Amino acid sequence: MDLDLLRQRYLGETAASARAFREAARLIPGGVQGNIKYFDPHPLSFASAEGSWLTDADGRRYVDFLLSFGALALGHGHEVVRRAIAEALEGYGTTSFGMPYELERVMARKISERFPSIATVRFTNSGLEATLLAIRIALAASGRTHIAKFDGHYHGGHDRVLVNTTGGRRPGGGDPVAHADSLGLAAYHLEHTVVLPFNDVESSSRILKARSGEVGAVVVEPVQAGYIEPEPGFLNAVRALTSDLGMVLIFDEVKTGFRTALGGAQEYYGVEPDLTALGKILGGGLPIGAVGGRGDLMELCSPARSRNLADVVFHSGTFNGNPMSLATGLATIGHLEEPGRFDELLVGTEALKRGIVASGRAHGFNVETPGAGTIFNVAVGLQDEGDAREFSPQFLRQCLDYSLMHYGVFSKPMNRFSMATSHRNAEIAHTLSAFDSAFGELATLVEGAR
């Protein structure tokens, strides 16, 4: 069985999803509401969800490790989230005030308690908006025009950061070369973005020192893509370097906040940034983002400083800090904070990772599960060097993903795995059984090609 046959089997099992995709493609560009949500030959169309399980349009069920790209820490439809929505709507009588109210203060206080680097907070409606605002604040504070980001790091779909999100362009092993990752990106953004190599202190230091008069902000995913960890001491070095050069350090913790640790990667690695961008879990499954950090930086957003727009960092949004998102976010965080809850989630994550590695090795594969906290990925290689030259890790992972969907496990092909409290022993057992069957199919594929 090869990749084409795996896809043919997928087509045969997902006819209703295929029909839904064809209809969607007539109404929605590409048939999806975000480019990363597409995969060949068509994405699954889902009908319902409960706990850790998804049901697609064909009635097939999957243990879900996509979890809305990591936003669902408790799984789907958890009772505390349902109750929070109902109580907020009943108590406030509205889904949005559009003006100040109680939960804004409650959530701001909770974030500050969990993230000691955060003195004050502004809410947004997405992680994208959060990184956009953080960069705006940083450049206003520094008085400089350029930002620096790391090769392969993703900070949302706005123009300032749609540069080198995929990484990999280092001619001759030299410094990363800036490239646009979207049509319509003005040359200005490439010209005003300095790209740094992640986990390379020496090169990053050299580049930043050479551009120190221009770069006002350095934005980084402290754990790249949520699962590629920083080398020991790397974040500390970036922290010291940005402080020495008068640059504002921004941690994009949209993926890692409440996942790597309850206090994010900055708690896990013991490094405090100047500004932090949050999202995903912060909303408990509803749209949200937040920027927080040093009081002097955040105060640049305060309209009390001046009524002249040009003297203040502009920030606004109709639904910023709305009752539904803050209520579900507070309920989710509160559940994760219950004694032993997050530790239990970490134990389940590690048990699953160990089982996946053991299963893969039993079938003749080198398997790694890089990650920190409750996010990880699965990398597959071959133990035989001759076979390894013929079958790339990317090809093997693609085959594995289509097999996993056949056996009832979903993370979206080539995507990372996120854990939820709803992943109990039964779901972990089902998942390990699926991996064992999928690795078996993969071994047959490799053997048949010899």
Regions found by a protein language model. Give the residues of each.
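Conserved N-terminal phosphate-binding loop of PLP-dependent enzymes in the Aspartate aminotransferase
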Residues: 1-450
